[in-house]
Amino acid sequence: MILGTRGSALAIAQADLVTKMLEEKGHELTRNVIKTSGDVFTDRPLHEVAGVGVFVRELDDRMIEGEVDIAVHSMKDLPTVRPPELAIAAVLKRDSPYDVLLTADGSTLDELPDGAIIGTTSMRRRAQLLRYRPDLNVEDLRGNINTRIQKLKAGQYDGILLAEAGLQRMGWDMDVQRLPAEAFCPSANQGTIVVVTRADDEAERACSVLNHERSRMETEVERLLITDVEGGCIVPIGSFAQMNEDGDEIHVLVEVLAVDGTREIRIEDDIPVKNYREHALSIGRMLVEMGGKELVQEAVCEMSGCDDE
């Protein structure tokens, strides 16, 4: 089987993990490294790279064309609407879903001075950061995880926001501050690796044994919560679901923010595992009724520079 992956250090680390798991099951794999739009256009913010799925589209196309059999992704990059020819064969056990702050001098978010420069590649993190500390200067930060950290060390930023899972997968033990989900609700599926194959394919059957059912349920809930507001992973939307220890309820938190963090529409609730899909979709509809879709459209318009008429 041919496994397709992006070429960044983090993507390769994730592909290595899946390769090892499949080889332990007796499967033989070769690798095809593919550049995506998100990798090529690193000189501009993500929202300026056309459309959603900027890290996924090319791999989807290669798989549909039969050039690769398996693709490994950070699940947060996977668009909500997927090609019908493709299947989510496995959701791996989730790593940390949280954001972390890495600063040049070890300062926490509350300790940073007024006007400190914070770098992030995410409009969600930007909006949440400005909501929490409107005095900070938040600037765009592109590049792979190594490049971002080098820019911090070079003094271009006082701090940077990253996904904790990325640091963990790289095997880096750094002095970071984990940011609470209550203030920094993660992107849907953050910290989760997903394995995609063609539907009803031999590769799907081979990869299905890697599936972690609890993680699959939590990530499905997070995607259902934001299905109706749309917008993709580039707009300021957070969606987080976490099953309790008894396994009978899922705590959910979903929010849509204005780009500058001054407004939010937010719902937090506990839903029963029984009929969880219906409950998650109901909360998603409620988010729309409260004005969530309009706030998403406003954010998209602001980021794309369209005029109000």
From Swiss-Prot:
Pathway: Porphyrin-containing compound metabolism; protoporphyrin-IX biosynthesis; coproporphyrinogen-III from 5-aminolevulinate: step 2/4. It catalyses: 4 porphobilinogen + H2O = hydroxymethylbilane + 4 NH4(+). Its EC number is 2.5.1.61. Its cofactor is dipyrromethane. It is an enzyme of class 2 (transferase). GO terms for biological process: protoporphyrinogen IX biosynthetic process. Keywords: Porphyrin biosynthesis, Transferase. InterPro entries: HemC, Porphobilin_deaminase_cofac_BS, Porphobilin_deaminase_N, Porphobilinogen_deaminase_C, Porphobilinogen_deaminase_C_sf. Binds 1 dipyrromethane group covalently. The modification S-(dipyrrolylmethanemethyl)cysteine is found at residue 233. One of its GO terms (cellular component) is cytoplasm. GO terms for molecular function: hydroxymethylbilane synthase activity. Pfam families: Porphobil_deam, Porphobil_deamC. It comes from the Archaea. Belongs to the HMBS family. The porphobilinogen subunits are added to the dipyrromethane group. Tetrapolymerization of the monopyrrole PBG into the hydroxymethylbilane pre-uroporphyrinogen in several discrete steps. This is Probable porphobilinogen deaminase. It comes from Methanococcoides burtonii (strain DSM 6242 / NBRC 107633 / OCM 468 / ACE-M). The lineage of its organism: Archaea, Methanobacteriati, Methanobacteriota, Stenosarchaea group, Methanomicrobia. The gene is hemC.
